[in-house]
Swiss-Prot record:
Family: Belongs to the sulfur carrier protein TusA family.
Gene3D superfamilies for the chain: TusA-like domain (3.30.110.40)
Pfam entry (one): TusA
Family annotation (InterPro entries): TusA-like, TusA-like_sf
Annotated signal peptide: none
Entry coiled-coil feature ranges: none
Residues of the active site: 17
Protein name (Swiss-Prot/TrEMBL): Putative sulfur carrier protein TM_0983
Length: 79
């Protein structure tokens, strides 16, 4: 069973800043409150920047899950 009921998945693996940050913001703009965005990243700096951006926008980071060496999933709840 899935941890979260993901509404949308964004895969920005292979991209470096600022692309993952910009694409995450763009995806969140098109989502409704209560929906969950799952973001796949492999750029370590994005693991720090995306949560900062998300919080500034007023959304909630539910979890940052390490899924492999230098690979993470960030779960974001739209507020």
């Amino acid at each position: 069973m899935a941890k979260y009921q993901v509404t949308k998945t964004l895969d920005v693996r292979g991209e470096v800043c600022p692309v993952p940050d910009v694409e995450t913001k763009r995806a969140l703009q098109n989502m409704k409150p209560g929906e969950i965005l799952e973001v796949w990243i492999d750029y370590p700096m994005s693991k720090e920047r995306i949560p900062e951006t998300v919080k500034k926008l007023g959304h909630e980071v539910l979890e940052i899950e390490e899924v492999g060496p230098s690979e993470w999933k960030i779960y974001i709840k739209v507020k």
